[in-house]
């Protein structure tokens, strides 16, 4: 069973980013994972570009907007070292897909080797948290990275019975 707490830290959280497009979001958040050493061979820009391509491939197959102004873009590729999560809260909602706006983004990176169940577990835990009104309210009101991280860890580690 995957532990979300092991996949995210304060260096992977960004609040009130002033980004205007989905492209800016995907590139900026992928760059964060790249700079934080979450992708293999972090000196090679092609690695970051490969991860961004994996994100776009997923978006083109089906939008990763999940409602409540949340998006969960995710990429499975050989350029990801180990599963990781990055979170961004934007200053303003942006157009994510037709009739879908997003302000809160969880980006998931999973290595091609780990993709199967691990990838689905992460999506389920984040999606379940997003369905919780209190989780969304707390993330909206969080004042700093530390508080945001505590909220994410608290809700993602809850055992759900429903």
Where are each of the predicted segments found?
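Cytosolic covalent-transfer regions centered on His/Cys nucleophiles
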Residues: 1-162
């Amino acid at each position: 069973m995957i532990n979300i707490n092991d996949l995210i830290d304060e260096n992977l959280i960004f609040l009130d980013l002033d980004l205007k497009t989905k492209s800016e979001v995907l590139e900026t958040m992928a760059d964060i994972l790249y700079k934080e050493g979450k992708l293999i061979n972090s000196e090679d820009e092609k690695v970051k570009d490969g991860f961004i391509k994996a994100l776009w491939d997923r978006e083109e197959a089906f939008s990763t907007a999940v409602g409540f102004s949340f998006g969960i873009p995710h990429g499975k590729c050989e350029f990801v070292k180990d599963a990781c999560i990055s979170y961004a809260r934007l200053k303003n909602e942006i157009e994510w897909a037709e009739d879908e706006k997003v302000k809160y983004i969880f980006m998931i990176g999973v290595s091609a080797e780990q993709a199967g169940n691990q990838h689905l577990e992460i999506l389920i835990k984040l999606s379940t948290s997003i369905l919780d009104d209190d989780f969304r309210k707390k993330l909206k009101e969080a004042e700093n990275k530390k508080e945001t991280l505590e909220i994410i860890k608290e809700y993602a580690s809850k055992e759900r019975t429903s």
